[in-house]
């Protein structure tokens, strides 16, 4: 599916009421769902273990060839001169809380950060001013183009 392969990681382990508890986190493609995965895990669990407190969210995905996605990526490429393509990511973003939204923004892994700056989503997240101004230009143009689309 669009999200790539199924991944499941072991999270925090702790002792609760004399029992070992292991949390798990899975990222799954759009071709399956949390209930199916939980059923398969339960079938594979050995004696003395159980899978409880299962929660899941349906994968959130919008096709890359929709007018809105094309407007965003075309704007990004025109402003930056790049030839970027839309991509999906495992994990949730704020976009899943809206019926037709995507997370959209610049990400430059080769960007030289200011001396005081840290990485994306860190306490000292920073970017050079020229990249912030470029992002602002991208957002303004993309929003104007999105305004023309009939959703």
Segments predicted by a language model, with ranges:
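Midchain, well-structured core segments that form catalytic/ion-binding scaffolds
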Residues: 1-32, 39
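Short, low-order "capping/linker" segments at domain edges
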Residues: 2, 61-78, 105
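A short linear hydrophobic-aromatic micro-motif
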Residues: 9-11, 50, 82-88
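Zn-dependent metallopeptidase/amidohydrolase metal-coordination segment
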Residues: 16, 74, 82-149
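A generic structural motif
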Residues: 22-24, 58-61
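Transmembrane helical segments that form the transport core of multi-pass membrane transport proteins
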Residues: 24, 46-47
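Short amphipathic alpha-helices in soluble, non-transmembrane regions
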Residues: 35-46
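Conserved short beta-strand edge segments in small beta-sheet-based binding/regulatory domains
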Residues: 47-55
């Amino acid at each position: 599916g669009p999200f790539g392969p199924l991944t499941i990681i072991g999270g925090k382990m702790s002792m609760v009421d004399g029992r070992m508890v292991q949390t798990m986190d899975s990222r799954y493609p759009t071709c399956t769902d949390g209930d199916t995965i939980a059923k398969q895990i339960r079938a594979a669990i050995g004696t003395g273990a159980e899978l409880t407190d299962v929660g899941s969210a349906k994968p959130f995905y919008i096709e890359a060839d929709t007018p809105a996605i094309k407007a965003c990526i075309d704007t990004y490429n025109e402003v930056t001169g790049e030839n970027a393509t839309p991509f999906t990511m495992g994990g949730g973003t704020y976009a899943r809380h809206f019926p037709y939204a995507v997370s959209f923004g610049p990400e430059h892994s080769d960007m030289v950060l200011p001396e005081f700056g840290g990485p994306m989503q860190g306490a000292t997240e920073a970017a050079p001013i020229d990249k912030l101004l470029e992002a602002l230009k991208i957002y303004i143009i993309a929003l104007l183009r999105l305004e023309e689309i009939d959703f």
